[in-house]
Swiss-Prot record:
Name under which the protein is recorded: Translation initiation factor IF-1
Function (record text): One of the essential components for the initiation of protein synthesis. Stabilizes the binding of IF-2 and IF-3 on the 30S subunit to which N-formylmethionyl-tRNA(fMet) subsequently binds. Helps modulate mRNA selection, yielding the 30S pre-initiation complex (PIC). Upon addition of the 50S ribosomal subunit IF-1, IF-2 and IF-3 are released leaving the mature 70S translation initiation complex.
Localization per Swiss-Prot or TrEMBL: Cytoplasm
Keywords: Cytoplasm, Initiation factor, Phosphoprotein, Protein biosynthesis, RNA-binding, rRNA-binding
Domain of life according to the entry: Bacteria
Family per similarity comment: Belongs to the IF-1 family.
PANTHER family on file: TRANSLATION INITIATION FACTOR IF-1, CHLOROPLASTIC
Presence of keyword Cytoplasm: yes
Molecular-function GO term, any one: translation initiation factor activity
InterPro entries: NA-bd_OB-fold (IPR012340), RNA-binding_domain_S1_IF1 (IPR006196), S1_domain (IPR003029), TIF_IF1 (IPR004368)
RNA-binding among keywords: yes
Pfam families: eIF-1a (PF01176)
Length: 72
């Protein structure tokens, strides 16, 4: 998948799930399942419920995404 094909949206973490997965509510109201990107995992950045995050979505499956940034 090419880097240009991703859709970047902002959302809020609702609940943590097992295996570094999170339920995220997007700004448009949709709820998706998101996992943590490798760089965030590598730098031990904690993601808690209520955090604002940026999520990358694939155009092929809009119900799953990757958390790429946590706002301070």
């Amino acid at each position: 998948m090419a880097k240009e094909d991703v859709i970047e949206v902002e959302g809020t973490v609702i609940e943590p799930l097992p295996n570094a997965m999170f339920r995220v509510e997007l700004e448009n109201g949709h709820k998706i399942l998101a996992h943590v990107s490798g760089k965030i995992r590598m730098h031990f950045i904690r993601i808690l419920p209520g955090d604002k995050v940026t999520v990358e979505l694939s155009p092929y499956d809009l119900t799953r995404g990757r958390i790429t940034y946590r706002y301070k």
